Amino acid sequence: MSNRIASDSVMTHTLLVMAGGTGGHVFPGLAVAQALKEQNWHIHWLGTAQRMEADLVPKAGFEISFIDIAGVRGNGLVRLLAAPFKIIKAVIQARGVIKQVKPDVVIGMGGFASGPGGVAAWLMGKPLVLHEQNAAPGMTNRLLARIANKVLTGFAGTFDAQKTADRQGQDVSDSAKYQWVGNPVRAGFATIMPKQISGISRATNVLILGGSLGAKALNENVPLALAKQNEIKVRHQCGKGHLDSVTQLYQNQLGDSGDWQVDEFVEDMPQAYQWADLVICRAGALTVAEVAASGVAAIFVPLPHAVDDHQTKNAQTLVEHEAGYLLAQNELVQGGLTSLLEACLAQPNMLVEMGNKARKLARLDAVQRVTHCCQLLVEKAQ
């Protein structure tokens, strides 16, 4: 199935982007796609019809095709036994898309479609690039890394093959298979101005981000902790389907006198980060990258059941450099956020210093590094 959007522009090369499921996969893919589109590349997307890419990708102006695939980890014995047949079917579907689109480069940014799509690209001899956003690589990318032409990572030392160079701060050559490029963020983050240490005489702006799908623990517990603080302004992104319940919770806790706003989705994320003095959030790879790029202090509450505990590992890349706080979800539920907030709000200059440390760890040119890799693969194939 394909949703095609016509274009009169002259295209030089074609990129097939495989990404979907959550904003952590889709938005980095869109950032790369937009950058290459501006260089006259034709962009086609491979995803699944039931996830957010089916809505976001056409809205961004890109063609998308769908394959039938879903996750297999933790889904019970029957689904596990059926998985090989579903994967084979999805690979065949992906081969059909590749045959139709004829991409010069295929890039997997994560999500269900990346596995079958990556195998199909390899079988058809197409240059395959992987981008692993998380500090702990997922099972699919660990397997696909063996057949990929390039493996790009959002964090240093994600794969064993790159640990030594990344630990020593080396920028490896273009010929290296494994390269630390950072996580692509939307173009608007480049315009965010660094915060200055001058003391915050106004109320402290607190931004709560539950991710593109929302976060139940943050939605239920953060308003309770914020109700005990003074001199704050609050913006809370609660995720689709949670607006009424979270709004009611703030109404009960802060009332009409409190300065708070609840939204299902934040359209202008760079503006929200620019506004914030402190962010309370999960620790998905994209969120950590956006926190660093924005130069804002953050309290990370990793999803406790994330595969391979990758969210904790993501957060630690900043926390280990005193560029963020780590709060386990069980500590959040037990009221640990209240005391941590009190300490943060009492030291506004410390928040600025923490944000500046985070910004120094960001790779603000991640999009350019990824697109450069795609260009090199095309040149090599010519």
Curated annotation (Swiss-Prot):
SUPFAM superfamilies per UniProt: UDP-Glycosyltransferase/glycogen phosphorylase
E.C. code: 2.4.1.227
Gene: murG
Keyword Cell cycle found: yes
PANTHER family according to UniProt: GLYCOSYLTRANSFERASE, UDP-N-ACETYLGLUCOSAMINE--N-ACETYLMURAMYL-(PENTAPEPTIDE) PYROPHOSPHORYL-UNDECAPRENOL N-ACETYLGLUCOSAMINE TRANSFERASE 1
Pfam families named among the record's database cross-references: Glyco_tran_28_C, Glyco_transf_28
Protein family (similarity comment): Belongs to the glycosyltransferase 28 family. MurG subfamily.
Binding site for UDP-N-acetyl-alpha-D-glucosamine: T22, G23, G24, N134, R186, S212, A285, L286, T287, V288, A289, E290, Q311
TM helices/strands, residue ranges: none
Membrane protein topology class: Peripheral membrane protein
Catalytic activity: di-trans,octa-cis-undecaprenyl diphospho-N-acetyl-alpha-D-muramoyl-L-alanyl-D-glutamyl-meso-2,6-diaminopimeloyl-D-alanyl-D-alanine + UDP-N-acetyl-alpha-D-glucosamine = di-trans,octa-cis-undecaprenyl diphospho-[N-acetyl-alpha-D-glucosaminyl-(1->4)]-N-acetyl-alpha-D-muramoyl-L-alanyl-D-glutamyl-meso-2,6-diaminopimeloyl-D-alanyl-D-alanine + UDP + H(+)
Function: Cell wall formation. Catalyzes the transfer of a GlcNAc subunit on undecaprenyl-pyrophosphoryl-MurNAc-pentapeptide (lipid intermediate I) to form undecaprenyl-pyrophosphoryl-MurNAc-(pentapeptide)GlcNAc (lipid intermediate II).
Key words of the record: Cell cycle, Cell division, Cell inner membrane, Cell membrane, Cell shape, Cell wall biogenesis/degradation, Glycosyltransferase, Membrane, Peptidoglycan synthesis, Transferase
GO MF: UDP-N-acetyl-D-glucosamine:N-acetylmuramoyl-L-alanyl-D-glutamyl-meso-2,6-diaminopimelyl-D-alanyl-D-alanine-diphosphoundecaprenol 4-beta-N-acetylglucosaminlytransferase activity; undecaprenyldiphospho-muramoylpentapeptide beta-N-acetylglucosaminyltransferase activity
GO CC field: plasma membrane
Pathway: Cell wall biogenesis; peptidoglycan biosynthesis
Organism: Pseudoalteromonas atlantica (strain T6c / ATCC BAA-1087)
Source species, domain of life: Bacteria
Localisation per UniProt entry: Cell inner membrane
Example GO BP: peptidoglycan biosynthetic process
Protein known as: UDP-N-acetylglucosamine--N-acetylmuramyl-(pentapeptide) pyrophosphoryl-undecaprenol N-acetylglucosamine transferase
